[in-house]
C-alpha cells in the first residue's frame, strides 16, 4: 500500500474493491490492527491504534471491532450458540447465552443453535459468523469477502442481514468485496489498484452528504487512515 489516506464517518457503509493483489485485504488487516504500517497512522474511534502494544490492541479489537472472515472461522468443537457466545463471555457479558440466542434468532437460525459447524451449510455458517461479529455491539464492523464462498442467493441473504443489523446497531460497516451488487449497496466505494487508492466514490451517498460538505470533528469519524505502506506486500484475496 502506498500513500493511502481517507476518513470514514461513523455509521457509514463502505466497500473496498479492486482486482486481486491490489491490497484490499491488506488494507482491511491494517484497519483491524492485525498488521502494522511501516509509516503513517491509523485511528479507529478517535484512537491511534498504530501506537498500541499487542495486548492493548487485542482488548481494543474485542471491545470496538467486529470481524467477518470469508472462510467463517467458527470453532468446530462449539455449537452455533457457543460460537456466538465466545466474545460475549470474554468481555464479561452476564447474559452471554441469552444475547447469543437473540442474535441467532435475528439471522434466522433459531432452530440451528445447538448444531455444530460441520452440521451447517455454508450460508448458515456465515450467518453464525455475522451474529458473532455483532455480538458485542461493536461500533466498527470489518468484513473480508463476506459473500465470497456463497452462492448468489445465499450471498444476497447475507447482504440483507448485514445491512439490517447495521441499521439496528448503528455500526460503521467496511467490507472488501468482488461482488458488484454488494458494493453498489454501500454508501461509499473505495477502489484500489496496485496498492494505491484509485477512486473514492459515493454512488448512493445521502445520509452523510452534509458531513462531507461541512467537515466533521474527530469524534464524528470512526476511522482515519494515512499510511504509506504495510509490513507486507499487497496479497491476493483467497
Locations of regions flagged by a protein language model:
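ABC family nucleotide-binding domain
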Residues: 1-185, 189-192
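Conserved beta-strand-loop-alpha-helix hinge in the C-terminal portion
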Residues: 196-221, 235-237
Amino acid at each position: 500500500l502506498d500513500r493511502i489516506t481517507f476518513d470514514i464517518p461513523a455509521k457509514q457503509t463502505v466497500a473496498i474493491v479492486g482486482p486481486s493483489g491490489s491490497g484490499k485485504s491488506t488494507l482491511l488487516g491494517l484497519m483491524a490492527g492485525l498488521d502494522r504500517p511501516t509509516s503513517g497512522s491509523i485511528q479507529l474511534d478517535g484512537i491511534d491504534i498504530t501506537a498500541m502494544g499487542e495486548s492493548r490492541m487485542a482488548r481494543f479489537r474485542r471491545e470496538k471491532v467486529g470481524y467477518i472472515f470469508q472462510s467463517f472461522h467458527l470453532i468446530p468443537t462449539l455449537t452455533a450458540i457457543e460460537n456466538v457466545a465466545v466474545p460475549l463471555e470474554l468481555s464479561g457479558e452476564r447474559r452471554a447465552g441469552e444475547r447469543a440466542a437473540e442474535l441467532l434468532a435475528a439471522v434466522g437460525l433459531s432452530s440451528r443453535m445447538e448444531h455444530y459447524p460441520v452440521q451447517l451449510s455454508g450460508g448458515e455458517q456465515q450467518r453464525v459468523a455475522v451474529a458473532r461479529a455483532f455480538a458485542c455491539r461493536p461500533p466498527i464492523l470489518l468484513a473480508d469477502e463476506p459473500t465470497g464462498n456463497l452462492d448468489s442467493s445465499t450471498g444476497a441473504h447475507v447482504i440483507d442481514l448485514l445491512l439490517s443489523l447495521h441499521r439496528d446497531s448503528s455500526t460503521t460497516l467496511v467490507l472488501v468485496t468482488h461482488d458488484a451488487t454488494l458494493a453498489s449497496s454501500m454508501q461509499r466505494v473505495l477502489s484500489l489498484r496496485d496498492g494505491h487508492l484509485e477512486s473514492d466514490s459515493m454512488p448512493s451517498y445521502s445520509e452523510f452528504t452534509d458531513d462531507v460538505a461541512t467537515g466533521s470533528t474527530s469524534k464524528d469519524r470512526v476511522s482515519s487512515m494515512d499510511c504509506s505502506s504495510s509490513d507486507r506486500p499487497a496479497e491476493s484475496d483467497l
